[in-house]
A protein has these predicted regions:
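Positively charged
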Residues: 1-176
Length: 176
């Protein structure tokens, strides 16, 4: 199993910056191996992880797609992603983040996401273009990870109405 990477917490400045595109010369075994290490770092309580969450400013994220029994059925390394279509109704569900945890537990809050996403990306080994339709939880994960690449945290997606962000941060401080 590949060596795990340390995951930075929500207040690390790299998480609020837009990530840089991966240039053609970076594609190959090194980029793919980084993706494998990121997948090893996701753990049992996550489904995705973006490069900024491991301290790297590059447009790369990984997903561990799970079945209804929560068993990983596929692992994907995604470089330079572009969501071409976000469709379906917008649904609100509780969402967590591997960079937003306290006492080893993820903190969750409601976030509104589209039900489906068509995604274009480059294969990390070859740089070849790939595309795929994602829906449900996988579509929410794609949107969450692209937000990380754009310097947006999941709590930034919520309106600051009713002190939701403040409440979440207070909860985080308490558990720290």
């Amino acid at each position: 199993m590949p060596e795990k990477l340390d995951i930075v917490l929500w207040d690390d400045p790299i998480l609020s910056k837009e990530s840089l595109p991966i240039p053609p010369e970076k594609f190959g075994n090194g980029l793919f191996d980084l993706g494998r290490r990121m997948l090893a770092s996701v753990g049992s309580d996550g489904i995705g992880l973006a490069a900024p969450q491991v301290g790297l400013s590059m447009r790369l994220f990984v997903m561990a797609i799970r079945d209804k029994k929560d068993k990983v059925t596929e692992e994907i390394v995604i470089a330079n992603p572009v969501a071409t279509v976000c469709s379906g109704r917008a649904a609100t569900a509780d969402e967590g983040c591997l960079s937003f945890r306290a006492d080893g537990r993820l903190l969750y809050g409601p976030v509104t996401r589209y039900e489906a996403v068509d995604l274009l990306w480059q294969d990390p080994l070859t740089g070849e273009e790939r595309k795929r339709h994602f829906d449900g939880l996988d579509a929410a994960c794609v949107q969450h990870e692209i937000d990380h690449l754009d310097g947006i945290m999941f709590f930034d997606r919520r309106r600051m109405k009713n002190g939701w962000r403040k409440k979440l941060l207070k909860q985080w401080e308490k558990r720290r």
